[in-house]
Swiss-Prot record:
Active site as annotated: 12, 131
Superkingdom, taxonomy of origin: Bacteria
Official protein name in the record: Imidazole glycerol phosphate synthase subunit HisF
Cross-referenced SUPFAM superfamilies: Ribulose-phoshate binding barrel
Naturally occurring in which organism (per UniProt): Pseudomonas putida (strain ATCC 47054 / DSM 6125 / CFBP 8728 / NCIMB 11950 / KT2440)
Pathway(s) where this gene product acts: Amino-acid biosynthesis; L-histidine biosynthesis; L-histidine from 5-phospho-alpha-D-ribose 1-diphosphate: step 5/9
Entry EC number(s): 4.3.2.10
GO molecular function: imidazoleglycerol-phosphate synthase activity; lyase activity
CC annotations in GO: cytoplasm
Pfam families: His_biosynth
Main function: IGPS catalyzes the conversion of PRFAR and glutamine to IGP, AICAR and glutamate. The HisF subunit catalyzes the cyclization activity that produces IGP and AICAR from PRFAR using the ammonia provided by the HisH subunit.
Reactions it catalyzes: 5-[(5-phospho-1-deoxy-D-ribulos-1-ylimino)methylamino]-1-(5-phospho-beta-D-ribosyl)imidazole-4-carboxamide + L-glutamine = D-erythro-1-(imidazol-4-yl)glycerol 3-phosphate + 5-amino-1-(5-phospho-beta-D-ribosyl)imidazole-4-carboxamide + L-glutamate + H(+)
Length: 256
């Protein structure tokens, strides 16, 4: 029996407000994170991802208070990331009510941190977030590189090899964002999504670029992702989660 594919609204939170940008820039306000999360819970979203997008850049810790408020009102799995650098950061988030914690920049600087976190808390609650950008030119074999600090700093690391390394260290899931597609609304980067999904045995969540319901289905059917994440199309009322599930089911995808 095929595992159900998940639909995950993503809340990018900047100074306590949900925002949405294009290619990590040009931010617009979308509202209060707890109100928005509650709406998605009521709509039947499978999970919610909360990313404090200011945390790594400004060196601030994720807003535990917002996580506590959200966890008290939302009863689906909650993944939280942004500024997670230590085992204590993870413990604090889990204690505040997060079900999973997403590690991004810190994994690049200290890959063993991922292994330590998985050993301490279990792989099931450790997500490694990867921000990838295509760096190969026309006619070259496709290659994607990892960027950190909210997509600002190149690392020289190959995205597919890095994802395999993270799986080996104990990551339970990969949250893969295409920086080329982020906020562009013309679909996922299916090349990198498929390359990483096919290389790993753990779930890959596709992120970055959803503009319509077909894009969500493409992430599963062509990108081979286990879950699809979107922000703009849900936040600004273009589509609802039930509409997304109905469309995916019509394409033959098993949804919850």
């Amino acid at each position: 029996m095929a595992l159900a594919k998940r639909i995950i609204p993503c809340l990018d939170v900047d100074n306590g407000r949900v925002v949405k940008g294009v290619k990590f820039e040009n931010i617009r306000d979308a509202g209060d994170p707890v109100e928005i999360a509650r709406r998605y819970d009521e709509q039947g979203a499978d999970e919610i991802t909360f990313l404090d997008i200011t945390a790594s850049v400004d060196g601030r810790d994720t807003t535990l208070h917002t996580v506590e408020r959200m966890a008290s009102q939302v009863f689906i799995p909650l993944t939280v990331g942004g500024g997670v650098r230590t085992v204590q950061d993870i413990r604090n988030l889990l204690n505040a009510g997060a079900d999973k914690v997403s590690i991004n920049t810190a994994a690049v600087f200290n890959p063993e941190f991922v292994g330590e976190a998985a050993d301490r808390f279990g792989s099931q609650c450790i997500v490694v977030a990867i921000d990838a950008k295509k760096v190969s030119g026309p006619g070259e074999a496709p290659r994607w590189e990892i960027f950190t600090h909210g997509g600002r700093k190149p690392t020289g690391l190959d995205a597919v090899e890095w994802a395999k390394k993270m799986e080996g260290l104990g990551a339970g899931e990969i949250l893969l964002t295409s920086m080329d597609q982020d906020g562009m609304k013309n679909g996922f980067d299916l090349g990198v999504t498929r390359a990483i999904s096919d290389a790993l045995g753990i779930p890959v969540i596709a992120s970055g670029g959803v503009g319509n319901l077909q894009h969500l289905a493409d992430g599963i059917l062509e990108g081979h992702a286990s879950a699809v994440l979107a922000a703009s199309i849900f936040h600004f009322g273009e589509y609802t989660v039930p509409e997304a599930k109905a469309y995916m089911a019509s394409r033959g995808i098993v949804v919850r």
